[in-house]
A protein has these predicted regions:
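Solvent-exposed, acidic/polar segments of extracytosolic/periplasmic ligand-binding ectodomains
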Residues: 41, 406-473
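Beta-alpha junction/loop-to-helix N-cap segments that form part of ligand/metal-binding clefts
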Residues: 31, 36-38, 89-164, 168-171, ...
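C-terminal motif of bacterial Sec signal peptides marking the signal peptidase cleavage site
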Residues: 21-25
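N-terminal extracellular/periplasmic Venus flytrap/periplasmic-binding protein-like
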Residues: 35-119
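Extracellular/periplasmic Venus flytrap/periplasmic-binding protein
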Residues: 166-277
Length: 473
């Protein structure tokens, strides 16, 4: 007997709004008609709909955040949709054209990302989804729980990974938090028995990360004080007032070390008041842009010297030289330069230049926004999986093909190499320590071609050594 439209609507609403919904219910559909069965939502004989979630940058500008002129919603979108255009021009994927469906949220109001989940799963359902960075992990999990394959360039909690539909570049917040704290303890940065503060948000990724970090700290005999900032309410002013108050909380607890599990957009108040306390900072790569070049340049000078263990790579070497790019990274840069040729007045992309910016270096060289690695990595993996899934495309056949890819390329991360196999929901295989390094505007280029070790005269993360470590799951 055919399923009623009313019952179908009820299932869709439950899947989209309930993060504990069972995947068996969420992955069924009236559109199940592929040759081998499975969910074919967003797929026709001639097309595949892929959702592209990007932040509406008008909200950030309205809130007073200074953004580079070329950093626009449209330009963010085409960093992904341009790959679809390229595939389509070459004949599509197994005879189908890929249609990008752009969905936006207001980054000043994180809860507006609920509409992205609603649209992707109910209103204008797509076959699969991409968010290269920035969207709240709560809403990434909402989409994954509804049985939609989703790629995410930032860090999500393990519960989102456990849906089986999420693929990230980095491991879960819990894995990153534990590995970061364990490394800090092993290196002596966090001494046994020391008083340790944790600066965190209250999103699911933050809460999960703090729980994992506390497990390792408690085993090390550390006294722990947590300052939790309300990141879910979305007002940067309130968040930064709360993070500023955390300074006094940590002073009262006589902490010597602080683990940072809070993104820069909510922690500026803390950094404005953190200087002069002789605290050691360990950054946990558990939230948006924590240990990326954009996150590094956005932190206040008082954060300089902090250490982060991250899968994300760098444009420089520990001995202060520009890092040679892999063949894949060169390909990513060439595609971005071709895409953005009219956005930066002819200035080529250059390692370390903040997203959307055009910059004149102290030696007079004019350069522009670095090539974005996440978009290149994700679309490359997605294309390979779509091709491998064949003509009888369903969400299930796509995920099986994706998990069976084996070795994959990663731009500016995991020492260039990642992997996919059954049960592995993230791409990276390696992690390494990086140190936040000062390079204020006007810093002179040194004899090795960098600016106090940074690729340009912008504060950056510099690797502390050449060794990459296997990720401990």
């Amino acid at each position: 007997m055919a399923r009623s439209r009313t019952w179908t609507a009820v299932i869709a609403v439950v899947c989209a709004f309930t993060l504990t919904a069972g995947l068996a219910a969420c992955s069924s559909s009236d559109d199940d008609s592929s040759g081998g069965g499975g969910n074919t939502t967003g797929v026709t004989d001639t097309s595949i709909k892929i959702g592209v979630a990007v932040s509406d940058l008008d909200g950030l500008r309205a809130a007073g955040m200074a953004l580079a002129p070329a950093l626009t919603t449209q330009n963010l979108s085409k960093r992904l949709t341009s790959y679809f255009d390229e595939w389509n021009a070459a004949g599509g994927i197994n005879g189908r054209q890929v249609e990008g469906v752009v969905m936006t949220w207001d980054p000043v109001k994180p809860a507006t990302a609920q509409k992205v989940c609603d649209d992707a799963t109910i209103n204008t359902p797509v076959f699969a989804m991409i968010n290269s960075n920035g969207m709240g992990a709560k809403y990434i999990e909402c989409i994954a729980q509804a049985g939609v394959p989703i790629f995410f360039g930032d860090v999500a909690p393990q519960s989102a990974h456990d849906t089986g539909w999420l693929t990230t570049i980095s491991p879960s917040a819990e894995v990153n938090a534990k590995s970061g704290i364990d490394a800090a303890i092993k290196s002596g940065q966090i001494p046994k028995g020391a008083a340790v503060g944790i600066l965190s948000g209250n999103g699911p990724e933050h809460v999960a990360a703090v729980a994992a970090a506390k497990t390792s700290l408690e085993a090390n005999g550390n006294k722990i004080t947590v300052a939790q900032i309300n990141t879910l309410q979305g007002d940067p002013g309130i968040q930064n007032t709360e993070s500023a108050a955390a300074v006094n909380t940590f002073k009262a607890a006589n902490v010597t070390n602080i683990a940072i599990a809070l993104q820069f957009t909510a922690s500026n108040g803390f950094w404005d008041n953190a200087g002069g306390n002789n605290w050691q900072f360990t950054f946990l790569d558990v939230a948006s842009s924590m240990c990326t070049p954009f996150g590094g340049k956005s932190l206040k000078p008082s954060a300089v010297g902090g250490i982060c263990f991250t899968v994300f790579g760098d444009s420089v070497t520990p001995d202060g030289k520009l890092k040679p790019e892999s063949a894949f990274e060169k390909e990513c840069r060439a595609k971005f330069d071709a895409l953005s040729v009219n956005d930066f007045g002819g200035a080529p992309s250059y390692p370390g230049v903040p997203s959307g910016e055009t910059r004149t270096l102290p030696d007079g060289t004019k350069v522009s926004s670095d090539a974005p690695p996440n978009e290149c990595t994700i679309t490359n993996v997605m294309k390979r999986a779509l091709e491998k899934a064949g003509k009888n495309l369903s969400r299930e056949s796509f995920m099986k093909a994706l998990r069976g890819l084996g070795e994959v390329d990663i731009a500016n991360g995991s020492n260039g190499i990642g992997s996919q196999k059954e049960g592995k929901t993230y791409l990276a295989t390696l992690t390494h320590p990086v140190k936040l390094t000062a390079a204020p505007t006007g810093t002179a280029k040194n004899a090795t071609g960098t600016y106090n070790g940074c690729p340009v005269d912008v504060q950056c993360w510099v690797p502390t050594g050449t060794t990459w470590y296997d990720i401990a799951s």
